[in-house]
A protein has these predicted regions:
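Short glycine-enriched, charge-decorated loop/helix-capping segments at active-site entrances
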Residues: 101-107, 145-148
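Hydrophobic alpha-helical segments within soluble ligand-binding/sensing domains
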Residues: 110-113
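Short, highly charged C-terminal tails/helix-capping segments
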Residues: 180-187
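A hydrophobic, small-residue-rich beta->alpha segment in the mid-to-C-terminal subdomain
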Residues: 151-152
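Nucleotide and nucleotide-moiety/phosphate-recognizing core
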Residues: 2-105, 115-126, 136-140, 155-161, ...
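Solvent-exposed beta-strand sheet faces enriched in polar/charged residues
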Residues: 89, 129-131, 218
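Conserved G1/Walker A P-loop phosphate-binding module
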Residues: 188-224
Length: 224
């Protein structure tokens, strides 16, 4: 029996925040594997079902990020789930957007949700760190993680969640390194300014406002 946890904040305006990527992963798992309808239990939204041959519970804590551990401890004590059978999905500033890193144990690396879980159940559980990149310029980290993904990132995010759910059986078998490499090899993200865009701008410069910026195209190359 496994517990899958997605970290985030429960308010409607937080839905597309970078900090809420864990919630999106749980939603994708629920949909792909037809888990039960979400029910408010253990201070979270709980679903259950099977992923392959494995019985799983999946939860999105409603305690807000900094108190995530309260929800997790109540649930694992009730269902008698060992901490080593807990897998947590969360955002990570130190991982490039479009990449993931799965590991067992370790430090919280300044992530308040992970720090809360460590406090209530210890460090002996698996984490899937999902890259959101770093803030640009002088934006505060707290502002960056509570900011919505931009349009280009939302396009990539859908593919990331699909890649994770497609490879979830590897994760459930606790082959963390293989899971990371499998997911990461499916997605290349490339930022380019295409010559054709510049040519288009030059050809249509008479119809463009002088103050209008030249378009910059972000391409997501998906490798299956």
């Amino acid at each position: 029996m496994l517990l899958l946890v997605g970290l985030g904040n429960p308010t409607p305006d937080s839905e597309n925040n970078r900090h809420n990527i864990g919630f999106k992963i749980i939603d994708a798992i629920n949909k792909k594997f037809g888990l039960s309808k979400q029910k408010p239990k253990f201070k979270g939204l709980l679903t259950t079902g099977n992923v392959g041959d494995q019985k799983v519970y999946a939860i999105k804590p409603l305690t807000f990020m900094n108190n995530s551990g309260i929800c997790i401890r109540e649930l694992i004590e009730y269902f008698k789930i060992d901490a080593e059978n807990v897998i947590v999905f969360h955002d990570d500033l130190d991982v490039e957007f479009g990449k993931i890193k799965a590991k067992f144990g370790g430090s919280d690396a300044g992530h308040n949700g992970i720090a809360s879980i460590d406090k209530f159940i210890g460090k002996e559980y698996s984490r899937v760190r999902i890259g959101i990149g770093k803030p640009k310029d002088k934006m505060e980290v707290s502002d960056f993680v509570l900011q919505n993904f931009d349009e280009d990132e939302m396009l990539g995010l859908e593919k990331i969640t699909n890649n994770i759910t497609d490879s979830i059986s590897i994760l459930i078998d606790k082959k963390l390194d293989l899971f990371s490499s499998t997911v990461n090899n499916k997605l290349w993200v490339l930022n380019v300014e295409l010559l054709v865009c510049l040519m288009w701008v030059n050809l249509h410069s008479s119809t463009l406002s002088q103050t209008q910026a030249k378009p910059k195209l972000q391409i997501f190359l998906f490798v299956q």
